[in-house]
Amino acid sequence: MGGTAVVVGGGIGGLAAAIGLHRTGWDVQVLERAGTLADAGAGISLHANGLRALDALGVGPAVRAASRPQYTGGTRTPEGSWLSRMDGAALERALGTPIVGIRRSVLHGLLRAALPAGCLRTGVTVTGLDRTAPDRVGVPVGDGMLDADLVVAADGVGSRLRGLLFPGGAGPVYAGSTVLRAITERPVRLRCDFELTWGGGAEFGHIAFSDGRAEWHAVLTAPAGVRHADPLGMLHRRFGGWHDPIPHLLDATRPQAVLHHDIHELATPLRSFVAGRVALLGDAAHAMTPNLGQGACQALEDAATLAAALAHEPSVASALARYDAERRPRSQAVARAARQAGRMGQRLSHPLAVALRNTGLRLAPSRVTMRAILRHADWTPPALG
């Protein structure tokens, strides 16, 4: 089909959408509000569905080369006993690829490198759209106006464009948990590639990177907006008595590297991901809690599906209708499952509830864990060409 497209938001989903559009013949501009693209320092796990989407977009091999496969790990108690283990090799046999861990900044750089020079513009804030014409969308930029056949709203959980397109609709809500995370300053020795540890009202996890360092995260049930003068000191007090390597990971972290964000989600699903010639994508469409590690993967699915629909359908309208029909039910189901996983994980605090959960996990056969992962990760992208 081809045409001109404006992608609002230069995160993982927005860049992936731009890659897909560019590969299928569209002239694309990406508008990012941030003035610089210095990454905040987080890491990310990519499941098979996210990697397959990246393969469809042509960047899968580069991402795999920069990632570390996550073969060994599972879920533990604060004392260190195992609640469940995951066989990454078995998962690879089932899906053709393991889960991989990668620094978000590295992934972002690989996506940027796949776009033409000059495609990405930073320091550009989009606060409105001109949708008066039936076959075009105007995007106000500074004192001018960009004219587009298609706009992709990938401006995150707090999307301004979502609020404009669906006035009066439910926006993001606080999910009841806050997350602190960082990447270690130096390589660390880890027995497992990834771990989750569930305590009462708290979770601690890590993923290992190819350079020997690791990202860790700590999720706490807390009121929204609570901050700490010394976040790393607070974490040492809260998690210092938990099993190794948790204290070791904290010791290997610089205080200024710790990031702190409240978790928000779209608890009320959108009735559509499309409004005229505008498509919502990623967190702007289906912001979810991070409990399944599927947020970025779902955004990558969005990007590949949108590009394929626009490549095969005869009109923008039919392509966006196909995109909405294929992506909205699946992504919203994953968001519901992530919310349920959070309730079973760090949100449980009563000792009896925690004990019952732990007993259930210990008794569950390993194939139950495998099925839970396959339910969301076993996805095949549509062909772009």
Which residues are covered by each model-predicted region?
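Short phosphate-binding/catalytic loops that engage adenosine nucleotides
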Residues: 26, 59, 244
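Histidine-centered metal-chelating micro-motifs
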Residues: 159, 179-181, 202-205, 285-286
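Conserved mid-domain beta->alpha element of the FAD-binding
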Residues: 7-35, 152-153, 180, 255-349
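Flavin-binding catalytic cores
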Residues: 227-260, 316-317, 324-325
